[in-house]
A protein has these predicted regions:
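Alpha-helical scaffold domains
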Residues: 1-143
Length: 143
């Protein structure tokens, strides 16, 4: 990362460099509620994740940045599984801001956790439709 920038600032600079206005506009028109949408696609985010490597502190910082679509999608890709607790998993799935975020969270992180089935069961009985969706997605990855 750049020496003068925090890791989060450097990542956001990279998002900006990879931005795609057509994708961003399409997501906004489709109802994406993020304040900031760069329009970076998932293969590009996976490339960024590969370059960064696993980093729990940065993953948590990205997940907390719920106003930016790409931050929320990148976070599960760089969270080390061995540092991700069941309590944190519960918080992340409950705070996932979109279907897309749930998809990435379940595929890239929750689906490979030893407690994935327990999280799926807990989500299934939730009143939240998004958490119920998470349960179904998670079940499809662990079956």
């Amino acid at each position: 990362m750049d020496g003068d920038k925090s890791p989060l600032q450097a990542i956001k600079h990279r998002f900006y460099a990879m931005r795609n206005g057509i994708v961003a506009d399409t997501l906004r028109r489709a109802g994406a509620e993020y304040r900031v949408i760069f329009g970076v696609n998932l293969p590009q985010l996976k490339e960024i994740a590969t370059d960064i490597g696993y980093d729990a502190v940065l993953a948590r910082e990205l997940w907390a940045n719920v106003s930016t679509r790409e931050s929320v999608l990148l976070a599960p890709m760089i969270m080390p599984a061995e540092e991700f607790t069941i309590d944190e998993a519960r918080r992340w799935v409950a705070s996932a801001p979109s279907v897309e975020a749930v998809d990435v969270l379940c595929l890239r992180l929750l689906g490979r956790m030893p407690f994935a089935a327990q999280i799926a069961e807990e989500c299934l009985v939730s009143d939240s439709r998004l958490m119920q969706y998470a349960a179904m997605r998670l079940r499809s990855y662990i079956s």
